[in-house]
UniProtKB/Swiss-Prot annotation:
The chain crosses the membrane at residues 1-21, 29-49, 60-80, 87-107, 118-138, 145-165. Pfam families: AmiS_UreI (PF02293). Its main location: membrane. It comes from the Bacteria. It is found in: Cell membrane. This is Putative transporter protein AmiS. One of its GO terms (cellular component) is plasma membrane. Keywords: Cell membrane, Membrane, Transmembrane, Transmembrane helix, Transport. The lineage of its organism: Bacteria, Pseudomonadati, Pseudomonadota, Gammaproteobacteria, Pseudomonadales. It is a multi-pass membrane protein.
Length: 171
């Protein structure tokens, strides 16, 4: 399931970057954010509530919900026409959570996938922190955040998702 989720996280991050660069409208980007938010939430609920759920899948589901809720909130903001400050502060919470996951991942990393996972969580922590600065504190960093979002889309989600789905990369 990781490959599936990462492929669509790559898509949503790519389109969010294009939106941040002013190339598409907020209402257009809401569609992919809603779709990926719902998809991620469904995967998270499966991981949490399936008959085979254990501590590992509970944790994976809880962390996946951080992504799902972020995308659903981005989608909602496009229709609520709010300034995004609440989402920005949520991004700070998620960034701090992602930092702890990154540290834990580096400490327990074994093999290429473990290292890749730790680096991903580090990049995601940085990305969410940048969204806190952009939205929560209204910093004028939209263009650099757009490019970081684009790089994150490609290297932490889209390409790894494709590699996992093609069974070139093993989780």
């Amino acid at each position: 399931m990781l490959g599936l989720v990462l492929l669509y996280v790559g898509a949503v991050l790519f389109l969010n970057a294009v939106w941040l660069l002013g190339k598409i409208s907020g209402r257009e980007v809401a569609v992919i954010n809603f779709l990926v938010g719902v998809l991620s939430a469904c995967v998270a609920f499966y991981l949490i509530f399936s008959a085979a759920a254990g501590q590992g899948s509970l944790k994976a589901g809880a962390l996946t919900l951080l992504f799902a809720f972020t995308y659903l909130w981005v989608a909602a903001n496009q229709f609520l026409e709010v300034d995004g400050k609440g989402l920005g502060w949520f991004c700070l919470f998620v960034s701090l959570t992602a930092c702890t996951v990154a540290i834990e991942s580096f400490a327990g990393a074994s093999g290429p996938f473990g290292l890749w996972n730790a680096v991903n969580w580090t990049v995601w922590a940085l990305l969410w922190f940048c969204f806190f600065l952009l939205l929560g504190l209204s910093r004028s960093i939209q263009k650099p955040v757009a490019y970081l979002t684009l790089a994150s889309a490609i290297f932490t989600a889209w390409l790894p998702g494709l590699l996992l789905l093609g069974q070139v990369l093993k989780a």
